[in-house]
C-alpha cells in the first residue's frame, strides 16, 4: 500500500470517532497496554506533558511545544484531530512524520495489531509513542483524545499534567454534569505529579482537589494567581501584559487565547521551576512563533485575499460563548458566516449564541457525523437566523465570497471538520 491507501486502511479498518462517533469509543486501556508492551514501552524513553480539557488543549499543547523548541529541546507533539493531513497529529519539532513511516508501520505491525481490533486512536497513539522514541525526542507534549481517565494516552506518567477547563461536551461518554466530566478529566492526575488547572468553577474545583490530594500531587489553579493582567490585539498578533514574563506577543489570535495564555504561563512557571525550561527568554520566542514552529491551524486563522475572513475550529457552547462576541466586534458592513456542525454537539444551544445580525451560509462537512445542512438551516430559522443552503463547505465559502463587499467580514466554522474541508479546498486550488 502507498501512503494514501495506508491512511484509508487506518480509517476504514479501525473504528474512528471522527467518522462514526460513539461506536469508535473503547472503554478501557487493555489495548493501549498491549500495544505499549509490544513496542517496548516507548513512552518511558522521554519526558512527557499531558494536556486534557474540553477547550483550549490544542492551542495550549502547540504553544508549550513551541516554547520547549525555542528552549532547545527536541519535542514530540501528539494532537487530534488533524485538519488536512493525518500526519499533522504526530510531529517532531513541528515536522510531520514521514509518509513512509506510516506505511512501514502498518505493513510491519498489522499482523500483531489486527487481532486486537484496536480503535483508530489506540493505534495512532501507539504509532506516535513509538515514533517519538525512535526520533529520540527529549520531551513530548501529549494531548488527550477524549476525557482523560480512560483515554488511551493515559498510560504515560508525565512530569506535568494540565487540565485546561471543563464544560459540557461528549456527554455520551463523560457524563452529563460538570462534576462527572471533571472526574473523567481528573483521571490524568498521577501520584506526585504536579497538575495545573486552567479554569475551574465551584462544581469542579473540589473534584480536582480531591483527586490531587489522593495522589499527593501539588495542584495549581491558574485563576488563583492570574499570569495575564491585560490583553489586546495588535496588527502583529495578540499582546499580553503578564505578571511574571513582561509583555508577550502571541501569534495565536482570538479573544479566547487569553484564557489559554493564563493556563500556559502557569504551566510554564512549573516547568521553569523544575528546570525543564532552562531559559526564560524561550517563553517570549516560543509564544510569538507557535504557528511557524508547530504548524497549528484553525485558531482564528486569517484566510487569504479579500474581504477579511477567518476560520476557527470552535465547536461547542463554551467555544461559541467566546467566538460570537468577537465576530460581532469585527468592524464590517456585513458579517457572513459559513456554518456547519456535527451530530454529537448541542446544536440548539449553539444557535442561541450565534450572532443575529449576520447572513448565514448553511452547510455540512464531509463526515458521516455531520448534521445535514437542511437540519442546521431549520434550527437556524427557528432562532431567527437566515441564509442559504450549500452542499459543501467549499461551495458555501465561494458563495459568501461572491456576495461579499470589500468591507464585509466572513467567518467559517462551527466544527473542526468545516475548517478541515475549507483548508483542504484552498490547498487544492492551482
Residue ranges and their predicted role:
Residues 1-53, 60-62, 66-71:
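Short functional linear segments
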Residues 22-29, 33-45, 70-156, 172-174, ...:
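ATP-dependent carboxylate-amine ligase catalytic core
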Residues 81, 124-173, 206-247:
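Extended acidic/charged loop-beta regions that coordinate divalent cations
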Residues 198-199, 211-233, 251-255, 278, ...:
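Beta-strand->loop->alpha-helix junctions that form or flank phosphate-binding loops
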Residues 201-211, 215-220, 235-236, 308-311, ...:
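C-terminal helical cap/extension that packs against the catalytic core
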